[in-house]
Amino acid sequence: MRVGVVGHRGYVGLPAVLNTLLDSAPALNFTLAFEEELWDMAEEGERLTQDTPIDAMITLGGDGTLLRGARLVNGRKIPILGVNFGRLGFLTSCSADEMEDGVQRLARGDFVSEPRMVLESCAIDGDRSERCRWRALNDVVMHKGGFARLVKFSVLVDGEHIGSYSADGLIISTPTGSTGYSLSAGGPIVMPTFESIVLTPVSPHTLAMRPLVLPADVEVTVRADDGPEELLVTVDGQVGTTFTGGETLIVRRAPEPVHIVRLPGATFFTRLRHKLGWGGLSGRDGEAT
């Protein structure tokens, strides 16, 4: 089995973890390929790019590392085992202490591959030419950047104008992304298996404009009508571009999902309770059942 490895270099114990993976690879029948940032730390194995043929991926870090790994998968049907070395790790498959068991289950095929809906987005310039395209597992966000002023957005769903948002920004999220930035901005929690697109305004200047849950098969179009001359579009909090008046952002469901490894007992609501304190109050998590 060819396995791609993506990791967060900021984790001080990462070299030891890479050595552990390399030492166990022969017994697991793994051939390891490391992303460019890790290859010099591993000192052996292959280099991992978007074009490297792999059968599975292991990410070593937090949710951001898993999101970066999902971009490298680039639409291929490759299960991603996320090992959490970060603070929250809501998307990851197991903790650092559970890594050995998780990797062995990956080798045996003893896991559930959970498909997660992905968004496909593109920026169209004033000449109607596509200049950028991205895939987002979490969200696509149009926001004002560093300017302390509102932006007025026009939003269309399947070509129908549904309203204008005066806000600091607009989050367009997947069900997976509903527990990320969208949740912080007051958006709803959506189960990952309920395919949909969530629109959540960031600090809207009205009480009438609330988050909106749309069917997964619609196309969302966003234009900036008024605000700073230059806005930002950010994808999964990691990549993006500038955005100016006269340009259009189009977001729709991508045809290929991302496949995240789920181990026995790791249900969505278990993670909600343990990671986000769902159903309990701060300091009283132990009372939740």
Curated annotation (Swiss-Prot):
Gene that encodes it: nadK
Cofactor(s) this protein requires: a divalent metal cation
The family this protein is said to belong to: Belongs to the NAD kinase family.
The UniProt record lists the keyword Transferase: yes
GO biological process: NAD metabolic process; NADP biosynthetic process
Functional summary from the UniProt entry: Involved in the regulation of the intracellular balance of NAD and NADP, and is a key enzyme in the biosynthesis of NADP. Catalyzes specifically the phosphorylation on 2'-hydroxyl of the adenosine moiety of NAD to yield NADP.
Gene Ontology molecular-function annotations: ATP binding; metal ion binding; NAD binding; NAD+ kinase activity
Chief location: cytoplasm
UniProt-listed HAMAP family: NAD_kinase
Gene3D superfamilies the UniProt entry points to: Probable inorganic polyphosphate/atp-NAD kinase, domain 1, Probable inorganic polyphosphate/atp-NAD kinase, domain 2
Superkingdom of this protein's organism: Bacteria
Protein name: NAD kinase
Any Pfam family the entry gives: NAD_kinase_C
Gene Ontology CC, one term: cytoplasm
Sections of the chain in a coiled coil: none
EC number(s) from the headed UniProt entry: 2.7.1.23
Enzyme class: transferase
Active site feature: D63 (proton acceptor)
